[in-house]
Amino acid sequence: MYFLLSPAKSLNETDAVPVHISNYYSQPELIEHSQALMKILKSKEPIDLQELMSISDDLSQLNAKRNQEWNWSVEQPFTDSASGNLAKPAGYLFDGDVYTGLDMYAMDKESAIYVNEHLGILSGLYGVLKPLDLIQPYRLEMGTKLKNECGDNLYEFWGEEVTNTINARMVDSDDTVLINLASNEYFKSVKKKALAAEIVTPRFEDEKNGQYKVISFYAKKARGLMVKYAADNKLTNAEQLKQFNLAGYYYVDELSDDKTWVFRRDAADQ
């Protein structure tokens, strides 16, 4: 099985990455496409970014600075050394609820390698990342209407690239089921009809006032927890995910079907 997650807007640029995975770093597969997008972003002033991304003045200043500092070339790729184009592996740079659940900082080498082989992180700038791909800080959500050589938005820019990359990775790892843990905004970049896989979308519901519903904060963390569960237990097929029980969640067969798997958590376990 192969998992998909969305990235995070918040970034962890300070915590040190465990040394045991440093030999497994890689460069983003679609980096040349990232260069084309960054060329456009570098031409934007902070006020332009503020309007384009609907962000505050402080965030627009920060991301304009990030854009100008972003640098990659064949001769000087990303590195974990301050003497080069300093970068950090994606699974450790992204912060927020999903990545709190995933918690790669606490993983041993074997679990980190498992995640790297079975997880793709969708990205507005990088297309689709492996967790151990080195990347530099950025902000570019997939839904951003950034005009480019292919059209008026990032969905037109990425076209079939994201889907083709996912298909190739699934073939390489003999995966036949895609576990969609990404948001609608990001999963829209995947051409479902061209995807050579069965798609399963887990749904996480929490009890509140006697009713079960999707609560964003909890659901995001549960998405990361599900990938962590698969890595910690070295799962080999999707059916094993129905045993997912971290943080009090349990699979509800009578509410699930082939495409949507429902997991619930009672109020007492929250």
Swiss-Prot record:
Any one Pfam family match given in the protein's UniProt record, by short name: H2O2_YaaD
GO cellular component: cytosol
GO biological process: response to hydroperoxide
PANTHER family: PEROXIDE STRESS RESISTANCE PROTEIN YAAA, PEROXIDE STRESS RESPONSE PROTEIN YAAA
Family: Belongs to the UPF0246 family.
Name of the protein in question: UPF0246 protein Psyc_0554
Organism: Psychrobacter arcticus (strain DSM 17307 / VKM B-2377 / 273-4)
